[in-house]
Design a protein with these regions (language model features):
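Helicase motor core with emphasis on the C-terminal RecA-like subdomain
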Residues: 1-254
């Protein structure tokens, strides 16, 4: 919807539109984004302004799409651009990833287990936490205890986030403590361990987050969940906080 982008594309020979995170098209996906629904109109507008005889090819990519989401994506482009998509699905199996759930009785034991795992395997590691303050605090505590770590979450300054991400990818430090905000567009091949300090908010998100380990198939990677029964209660509280109230809907409508 940016006029600048519109002008840039009109001045270039576009041979294909490639769309990543395509599950965002579908209301059934865990990351539905309204902005994605403008893409079809944008592509059609470009084709009309260029007076193109043939439609511009479109490719969509996603690592987390149920069958219903796939059908939504195909239906969207069929209706908007009269395009029929062919589906290429890779296997979900990652034989070099080893999954383990470690039961924890309380917060103290969970932190000690985290330290033990980091001591046992020195490698690029992502530790996922459910809240921004938890990510910041864990990174601070780990660094204090001799495990240099940095945090990454949505409330951080953009420059700091970018600096931490780039330093992690470059291998300047090994432990990234992050919320689910970390990962999109990140492709670090040598991550040998992903630890979920808190459970993910969906199975799809968990698969995507754990799948950031072992991108190099020659690496045997570990994926741990440190689970405590209280985590479920906290998880439901977080989910309830994301619900939109009727009053909020009325305010948006106004």
């Amino acid at each position: 919807r940016s006029r600048t982008i519109d002008r840039l594309i009109l001045g270039r020979n576009v041979v294909r539109f490639v769309i990543d995170e395509a599950h965002c098209f579908s209301a059934w996906g865990q990351d539905f984004r309204v902005d994605y629904l403008y893409i079809g109109d944008f592509i059609r507008s470009i084709q009309e302004k260029k007076n193109m005889a043939e439609p511009i090819p479109v490719s969509c990519f996603t690592a987390t799409a149920k069958q219903k989401v796939i059908e939504d994506i195909r239906s969207y482009f069929r209706e908007k651009l009269s395009l029929e998509f062919e589906v290429f699905a890779s296997k979900a199996s990652r034989t070099n990833l080893h999954f383990k759930v470690l039961a924890q009785t309380d917060a103290a034991q969970k932190y000690q287990t985290l330290r033990r795992l980091l001591e046992a395997k020195s490698c690029p590691t992502i530790v996922y936490a459910s809240r921004t303050h938890r990510a910041t605090e864990l990174a601070r505590c780990l660094t204090r205890d001799g495990f240099p770590a940095r945090a990454y979450h949505g409330r951080m300054d953009t420059r700091e986030k970018t600096a931490n991400q780039n330093a992690f990818i470059a291998g300047e430090f090994q432990i990234m403590v992050a919320t689910s905000a970390f990962g999109m567009g990140v492709d670090k091949k040598d991550v040998g361990m992903v630890i979920h300090y808190d459970i993910s908010d969906s199975l799809e998100n968990y698969i995507q987050e754990a799948g950031r380990a072992g991108r190099n198939e020659r690496i045997e990677a570990e994926c741990y969940v440190l689970f405590n029964e209280d985590d479920l209660n906290k998880h439901f509280v977080l989910l309830n906080q994301t619900k939109i109230s009727f009053k909020e809907i009325q305010q948006v409508w106004k």
